[in-house]
Amino acid sequence: MNILLSSTLFVLLMFQIIGSGMGCDMKVRGLDANMKKMILDLHNKKRQIVANGQQSGQPLAANMKELHWDDEIEAIAQRSAETCVFKHTAKSLRKSSKYSYLGENVYKGGYPDPIPRSVNKWYDEVKDVTPAVVKSFSDDGPMIGHYTQMVWANTEALGCGLVTASDGTSYLFCQYGPGGNYPGQQIYKQGPPGSGCKNGKSSKYPGLCN
């Protein structure tokens, strides 16, 4: 075996080791059906609250889509969670067969109940979002990117991965397709809920779009 081939195999092996979460003693790995449903429902309910003008200080949303669960994105997010490192996944690794770029929210905290804690923590950034930022996103100023990715109107797919280490620390990675948070773009179109839907309105979450 030549040196180049040996080096290539070594790099691939190290990538697999890092991606598998070795070095983190995992007590909980992955999400069951109830957990997935909870995460998805929490996201859609938060989006619905904003779209319908029930969030103080936030304008109505005309074109906010209902999110659906994406198994491929879940697998990508799970690999990231299994690194047990509290930092964003490299953008070059955040893509799926359908979406060229996936947004990402990351949470590190105690167990139990990392799901509602994480989603509520991300959403709490709404207090620093102004109507001007909704019209033209900017990441200058207070941290708002977790919230804005949660309610980015064109995002339609969600997948998350979870690891809880033996010390009780949970790592939750949620990825979103297509990703949002593009400077200068609108987070969502302002207007009566559902008035900007291109493929009809959601029957499960009134105010959101299919």
From Swiss-Prot:
What's the family?
A: Belongs to the CRISP family. Venom allergen 5-like subfamily.
Task: Kindly provide the PTM information from the record.
Answer: Contains 3 disulfide bonds.
Source organism (scientific name)? Scolopendra dehaani (Thai centipede)
Which keywords, in A-to-Z order, does the entry hold?
Answer: Disulfide bond, Secreted, Signal
Q: Which Pfam families match?
A: CAP
InterPro entries per record: Allrgn_V5/Tpx1_CS, CAP_dom, CAP_sf, CRISP-related, V5_allergen-like
Task: Give tissue specificity per the record.
Answer: Expressed by the venom gland.
**Name of the protein this chain belongs to:** Scoloptoxin SSD552
List the GO terms this entry assigns under cellular component, sorted alphabetically: extracellular region
Q: Do you know which Gene3D superfamilies this protein is assigned to?
A: CAP (3.40.33.10)
Secretion signal: which residues? 1-23
Q: Which domain of life is it from?
A: Eukaryota
Places the protein is found: Secreted
